[in-house]
Structures are given as C-alpha cells and as structure tokens.
Amino acid sequence: CMSKTVSIFNQKGGVGKTTTCVNFAAALGLKGKKTLLVDLDPQGNTTSGVGIDKTEIEKSTYDILINDEPAKDIVIQTQFKNLSLLPANMNLAGAELELAEEENRFKALKKALAPIVMDYDFIIIDCPPSLGLLSLNALTASDTLIVPLQCEYYALEGLSQLLGTVRTVKQHYNEHLELEGVLYTMYDTRLKLNSQVIDEVNQYFPNKAYKTTIPRSVKLAEAPSFGKPIFYYEKYSKP
C-alpha cells in the first residue's frame, strides 16, 4: 500500500485553506483511509478545527522540526474516524528563524515524517499562508499539492508566485512534486466574476481545476468553532 502526502497550499490567507485541510482529511478518514493531519501553521487552526485545544498542547510540529522529537510521540488521535493529528501551537512561529540556521533546512519535515509515513494511507499538511521555510518544508515532504483558490479577481495575483515556488522546490528539493488540483472555495453562484476567474485559472492550470466547487456556507464557516469537520457538525449541509 502506497502512502500519499498532500500539501494544501496557497500563500494568500483567507482562501479556505484550513477548512479544506480539515474536511478533506476527515472525508478520507470516513472513507476508511488512515489519515494524518499535519498542522504547520503557527495559528493552529487545523488543530482547533479537529477539537484539540492548542493552548493545552505540550509538544507540537515545532518539536519534530527543531528538537528532533519522534513524530510518533507527538501524534494525537482525534475523536474522528481514522484521523490523527500532528498539532501546532504558537512555538511554531519561531521555527522559521531556527530552521534558517540548519544545514538541511528544507528537509526537516520530510526527515521527521519518514519513520511514520507508511503507517498512513494519507498525510495532509496545512501550510502557513506564506512562502517561507515552513511551506517549503511541506512541499519538499509532499507528493502533490492542492491549491484552494477563492473565486475572486485578486486570487489570481499570487498564482505566478506560487507556481514559481513549486518550480523551485521541484528543481532543488523534490523533483517528484506535482500539482494535484485547484479547488475553488467560497464560490458564489450569483456572481458573474466567478466564471471569469475560472476561465483565467483554466489557462494557468489546464485540466487541473476540480469540477466540484465549495460554495459559501454558514454551516461550513461555523463548524471550526465547534472543533468539528463539517461531516460531523452538519452532515446534510448543502455541499
């Protein structure tokens, strides 16, 4: 059985990255896939999104990156089916500066995950909204990435930068990295602009955009504050 590691990455904040991460991982778990969520965002919203109190966590992804703690000792089983978590807390905010001192600064996460990769069918990484060392570590450790994209005109501004980063990672650190797909989030069917954005994205990423779009949804927006993926919070919420 092959394990697959996927980064959810967009250096723009507020595009539904964490929501995508938590719910994608929860869906895989419900489908019977053993799934590990890796929270690499110092804000720790993925951690709280699966019901873990990030202020109570003694050790986090910071410790596997900087202190060489074994990842298996830090993994938390969530209350959700087949879903485990490597949590984040505020310590992670200092990780970029500390990683900068390391010789293998881009490969710290890959090295930390290596002993446990085969324990999971999927590893899903929530990247911080930046092009810094944490995101580069995520991309170096991943087989593929999914780019959540808000359907608005400004969403396109960061795309060439994002593609440049992916190219750099492929060239120097991880030649196997592939773009899995582009996921449209916060989709409002009433807006004409959405379809313009979609046409333009299709030029950037031919055949990479998912047909499924994630509409704006109150329930989807509420679920994280209850620490639950959408399937456990409001199963019949409009998809």
Describe these PLM feature segments:
Residues 1-239:
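P-loop NTP-binding core
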